[in-house]
A protein has these predicted regions:
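FAD-site-proximal beta/loop scaffold in flavoenzymes
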Residues: 76-92, 181, 185-222
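Short glycine-/small-residue-rich Rossmann-like dinucleotide-binding loops
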Residues: 46, 60, 64-65, 173, ...
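Core beta-strand elements of the Rossmann-like FAD/NAD(P) dinucleotide-binding domain
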Residues: 49-58, 175-185
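Rossmann-like dinucleotide-binding cores of NAD(P)H-dependent redox enzymes
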Residues: 5, 9-19, 87-88, 93-97, ...
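Phosphate-coordination loops involved in phosphoryl transfer and adenosine-cofactor binding
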Residues: 31, 39, 56, 77, ...
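Feature captures the FAD/FMN-dependent oxidoreductase FAD-binding
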Residues: 2-58, 151, 158-168
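Conserved N-terminal Rossmann-fold NAD(P)-binding element of oxidoreductases
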Residues: 61, 99-100
């Protein structure tokens, strides 16, 4: 509870600071849902229900990203966490499975391990932190291996189901015992996807690829 309260206080300070900066810079801040009418006009449905039309000469698409879903996950459950909900749990799970050996999964997993959870990490590639410098990965693997209950590389999650008692997971990998494994909670950390489903974006010449990424040039212009 103390750690979660501290996290919430940090978030509150950051958002309050951004609000102060917008006022100091005379930024007109609108809170609502935006829809593009064309390449020079956006309509905002405000939180109070009113409508604002905002013309512009140039716009910045900064809608952020969200945690990617796992293909083997058929439904949502409170016992299945992402990188956002993992920072807001009420108690530390006894057994935590981290799906994804990237920096997000390892960072959050190491926190839970320090808090007393038995953390198991599953990564579908042959190494933790895919794409990172191999020398750094070796050091991190030794360090994380000393606190993790288990690390399974070259391993995929083929099935995952959750109920009020636990999360049942089936893994497919060279070092995994056959059969299902049960965990108190599961953290899905398999990357992030862009929030590019912007209403009216198809009314512009902006190019969006099949994965949802906006096409830009070397100067990040659409």
């Amino acid at each position: 509870d103390r750690l979660r309260s501290w996290k919430n206080s940090v978030v509150s300070k950051l958002t309050a600071g951004l609000g102060q900066l917008t006022r100091q810079r005379n930024v007109d801040y609108l809170q609502g849902r935006a829809s593009l009418v064309d390449a020079r006009t956006v309509v905002v449905t405000m939180t109070d229900g009113s409508i604002r039309e905002v013309p512009f000469d140039a716009g910045i698409l900064a809608t952020g990203s969200r945690p990617a879903r796992l293909a083997a996950l058929s439904s949502e459950h409170d016992r299945i966490l992402d990188s956002t909900s993992a920072l807001d749990v009420n108690q530390v799970p006894g057994r935590l499975l981290v799906i994804g050996g990237g920096y997000i999964g390892l960072e959050i997993g190491s926190v839970y391990a320090a808090l007393g959870a038995a953390v198991t990490v599953v990564e579908m590639t042959s190494t933790l932190l895919p794409g990172a410098d191999a020398d750094l990965v070796r050091v991190l693997s030794r360090r994380f291996g000393s606190v993790a209950a288990a690390i399974y590389l070259d391993t995929k999650v083929t099935r995952i189901t959750a109920d009020d008692e636990a999360v049942t997971v089936r893994l497919d990998g060279p070092d995994v015992a056959s059969g299902d494994q049960r965990f108190d909670q599961v953290l899905v950390a398999v990357g992030r996807v862009p929030n590019s489903e912007i209403s009216g974006l198809d009314q512009t010449a902006v190019d969006v690829d099949p994965r949802g990424f906006v096409g830009v040039d070397a100067q990040r212009r659409t």
